[in-house]
């Protein structure tokens, strides 16, 4: 099986779900993080069992982002996750998960639940969806989120140790053609 895990419906009916987890992936997890990572992946996949999907029309990045938002709020995010604003808001997984966390913080408890519930019975139409929930286009929300992210610190100019400076001065002096006879 490629990837980490996936959730699928059952042939019985849509109320029965199956979670498939890659044994190769489990075996590759650092033993110090294995329990937490397995729990995190299972939480993510369990969300897929209960979340709505806009009658099959919601972007995959939003679906995965909701699942990673729940994982994040459960305290099970892996150490390599980063808040970043590169690309589109619906790039998915932690990228969208952190965006949804910002929405929850900015618009109040239950905001992500409102997003999920709005996907229950009607098709996802981006132009309408976010404005109905938050009164703004998703691009405007994404831009606000981007503005709220900490700005990267500018790189400080590396200061050369005094010994390196002295060595460079000596070499320059030795190589100076005017001193050669």
Give a label for each model feature.
Residues 10-13, 30-32, 41-42:
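Short, charge-rich binding segments
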Residues 25-33, 37, 52-57, 85-89, ...:
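Second-shell loop/turn segments in exported
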Residues 40-53, 64-68:
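Active-site recognition of the HExxH zinc-binding catalytic motif
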Residues 90-97, 103-181:
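Pan-zinc metallopeptidase signature
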Residues 54-98:
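Post-HExxH zinc-binding segment in Zn-dependent metallohydrolases
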Residues 20, 49, 68-70, 101:
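Structural recognition of the beta-strand scaffold that forms the well-ordered cores
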Residues 1-19:
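Auxiliary, metal-adjacent structural segments of Zn-dependent hydrolase domains
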């Amino acid at each position: 099986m490629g990837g980490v895990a996936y959730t699928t419906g059952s042939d019985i009916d849509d109320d029965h779900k199956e979670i498939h987890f890659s044994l190769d992936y489990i075996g590759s997890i650092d033993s110090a993080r294995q329990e937490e990572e397995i729990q995190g992946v299972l939480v993510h996949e369990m969300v897929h069992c209960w979340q709505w999907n806009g009658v099959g029309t919601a972007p995959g990045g939003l679906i995965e982002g909701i699942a990673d938002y729940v994982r994040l709020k459960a305290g099970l995010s892996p150490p390599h996750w980063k808040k970043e604003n590169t690309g589109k808001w619906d790039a998915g997984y932690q990228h969208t998960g952190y965006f949804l966390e910002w929405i929850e913080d900015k618009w109040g408890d239950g905001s992500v639940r409102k997003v999920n519930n709005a996907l229950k019975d009607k098709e996802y139409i981006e132009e309408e969806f976010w404005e109905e929930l938050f009164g703004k286009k998703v691009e405007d929300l994404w831009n606000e989120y981007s503005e709220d992210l900490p700005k990267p610190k500018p790189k400080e100019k590396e200061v050369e140790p005094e010994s390196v400076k002295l060595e460079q001065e000596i070499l320059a002096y030795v190589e100076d053609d005017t001193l050669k006879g």
